[in-house]
Amino acid sequence: MKLGIVIFPSKMIQDKANGLRKRYDPHYALVPPHITLKTPFETQDEQLESIVNKLHTIASKTNPFTLHVGKVGSFAPVNNVIYFKVEKTPELTFLNEEMHSGFFTQEREYAFVPHLTIGQGLSDAEHADVLGRLRMKDFYYEQPIDRFHLLYQLENGTWTVHETFRLGKGNN
C-alpha cells in the first residue's frame, strides 16, 4: 500500500493553485493541491494501525499554526517544478522531522522545502516562460492550519484520505 502525508490548504488557495495546475501539472486530477509533509512511501497493510497511532501522537505534540503562502518558486535546474512558496514555520519543520525519524525512518531524496506544486513535467522552454510570467504576479495567502492527512493511493493512481489528524493536545 502506498501512503503519503499532507496538509490541504483552504478551498480558496486550492482554487487558485488548481487554476494553474489544470494547465501546467499532469498530476492535476490525481490529488488536490497540498503541502507534502512526507513523500509517498510503501508499507504493508498490517503496519497501518501503528502508522496511524504514531501520527496521532505527532499531531497531539504539534500546535495549530498559520500557513503563509506567497511568491512563486522553482526547483530548476534539479527539476522543472513550479510552486507557490510556503513559509517554513517551526510547526511545519517539526512535523516533517517527526515524519522522517524513528518509526518513519526513510532516506530523504531532497531537503524539506514546503511548497504547493502548480506546474511540473514542463519542457525547459515552457518552464522558463511560465515561471517568468508567474513571478511577475503577486500571490499571498494565509490561513490557520489545525490538521494534516494520511492519504493512500488507489489503483487508478488517484489519492484519497485515509484519516485526518487534528493538531494540539486533546484533539485526537
UniProtKB/Swiss-Prot annotation:
Keyword Iron set for record: no
Keywords attached to this entry: Hydrolase
Pfam families given in the database record: 2_5_RNA_ligase2 (PF13563)
Active-site residue numbers: H34 (proton donor), H115 (proton acceptor)
Ranges spanned by the short sequence motif HXTX 2, renumbered to the chain: 115-118
Motif HXTX 1 positions after renumbering to this chain: 34-37
Keyword Membrane found: no
Enzyme Commission number(s): 3.1.-.-
Molecular function GO labels: hydrolase activity, acting on ester bonds
InterPro entries: 2H_phosphoesterase_YjcG-like, Cyclic_Pdiesterase, YjcG
NCBIfam families: PRK13679.1
Family, similarity comment: Belongs to the 2H phosphoesterase superfamily. YjcG family.
Name this protein carries in UniProt: Putative phosphoesterase BA_1241/GBAA_1241/BAS1148
Lineage: Bacteria, Bacillati, Bacillota, Bacilli, Bacillales
